[in-house]
């Protein structure tokens, strides 16, 4: 069995021929690893996810996926009044079949998945009554019970409060380390990527990118260039464990500049 889950070779994609979102992109996603995709808005992160799940086709190059994919979008709405358990059970649709009822084993597996994301107590709650963050956790559980080999997550912590961000990041790490799943995630949070990712891809726009080991490429220099904001990479010990993280630096001068820019935009809009 290959130790590579996804191979990206000379990959290119454009929406119009003179503006490439991706160009000559080379990357490898290791089986059982976490792969983070970072970049400002509009740099092609979602486009790359669409290529990975087969919703779009490359303009050039190739992309080889070895295994079944479960996709968790950034936002998810339900058209009918399903419970949280019903929504999560839909992940078992391929196993259950079109006209069959879920077995006891299906329900137990789904409740277990909900429990892993802290949502077992909400199993009978209507999905539409859950908060945005709670709905996202249910969809994570749905992806888990699909028994896919690769989870593709579009900004998995964007709708979550701080407690549930930590929960989801812990679960992402556990799904890779303990369950052997491959996880591909987009994120706007470099510290999240540094915490859980083995490898990363920085999308800098117009086909420019940087790929490699997360610890090697998530540097102050590369991230300052990417986000045009001052950042500091920090290392410290917490409960006997060495921790590395990345924090934005918001100085009094920068705060004043942001307030000034905001006021100028407001005046222009008026």
What are these model-derived regions, one by one?
Residues 1-8, 12-24, 31, 57, ...:
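A short, flexible loop at the N-terminus of ABC-type nucleotide-binding domains that lies
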Residues 200-213:
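H-loop (His-switch) and adjacent beta-strand-loop-beta switch element
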Residues 151-155:
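Catalytic Walker B motif of ABC-type/P-loop ATPase nucleotide-binding domains
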Residues 53:
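Helix-to-loop junction immediately C-terminal to a conserved catalytic motif
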């Amino acid at each position: 069995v290959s130790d590579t889950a996804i191979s990206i070779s000379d990959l290119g994609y454009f929406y119009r021929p003179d503006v490439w979102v991706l160009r000559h992109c080379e990357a490898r996603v290791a089986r059982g690893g976490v792969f983070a995709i970072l970049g400002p808005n509009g740099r092609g992160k979602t486009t790359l996810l669409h290529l990975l799940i087969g919703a779009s086709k490359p303009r050039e190059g190739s992309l080889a996926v070895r295994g079944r994919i479960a996709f968790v979008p950034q936002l998810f709405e339900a058209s009918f009044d399903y419970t949280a358990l019903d929504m999560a059970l839909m992940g078992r649709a391929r196993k259950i079949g079109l006209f069959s009822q879920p077995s006891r084993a299906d329900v137990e597996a789904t409740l277990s998945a909900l429990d892993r994301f802290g949502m077992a107590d909400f199993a009978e709650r209507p999905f539409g009554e859950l908060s945005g963050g709670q709905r996202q956790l249910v969809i994570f559980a749905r992806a888990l019970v699909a028994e896919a080999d690769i989870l593709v997550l579009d900004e998995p912590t964007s709708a979550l409060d701080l407690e549930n961000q930590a929960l989801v990041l812990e679960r992402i790490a556990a799904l890779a380390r303990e369950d052997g799943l491959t996880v591909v995630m987009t994120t706007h949070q470099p510290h999240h990527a540094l915490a859980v990712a083995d490898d990363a891809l920085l999308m800098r726009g117009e086909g420019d990118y940087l790929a490699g080991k997360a610890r090697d490429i998530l540097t102050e220099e590369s991230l300052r260039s990417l986000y045009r904001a001052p950042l500091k990479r920090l290392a410290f010990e917490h409960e006997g464990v060495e921790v590395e993280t990345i924090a934005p630096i918001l100085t009094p001068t920068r705060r004043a500049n942001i307030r000034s820019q905001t006021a100028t935009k407001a005046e222009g809009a008026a």
